[in-house]
Amino acid sequence: MTPSTEYAQMSVEEFEEIERHAPETVRLEFINGRLEVKAMPDGNHGEIFMWLLRQCMQHRPDLNLMPERGLKVEKYRKGRARTDGTLAPRGHFKGHGEWSSTDSGVLMAVEITSHDADTNRRDRVDKPVGYAEAGIPVYLLIDRDNDTLTVYSDPKNGKYQQTRSYPYGADVELPAPVGFTLDTEELKDYAH
């Protein structure tokens, strides 16, 4: 998410106005100065999210994994991303509007890849930068194209310093402040 705002299609304020008037069936994001349409999740996407939700509830009942949370991301919070999941303390988003700041409380952003043409750039390139620039401690990418989970952590100067990928079936360590291990054996049911 590096291009300067002078190359943006529109301002954040213009994006938010468009997003407010979009039908509920259309999910919009503003990533890297570009308006993005996020694919609607298929059944496997939803099942994988529910698997992760159960794991989070089991290991960290003090946290909520919020689906489809709108976050202010990138440098100076000039981007708007709608995560597949946002892990934060229970009650953290109480009173928040459509787009929440990530300045405190957001522990992890989660994306589950969709089968569309923009997945590579959006989930594997742009979002790791935007989430790191926003200071989100952990980014978990569940990649259905290559049956892996990638954990990004330790954001500094707009980049995650640590990146580790695991195949479906491995035990996946989520570092502090998340601080638990995922048993991913069940994800083999969704492998190619």
Annotate each PLM feature:
Residues M1-H192:
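Gly/Pro/Ser/Thr-rich low-complexity, intrinsically disordered segments predominantly at protein N-termini
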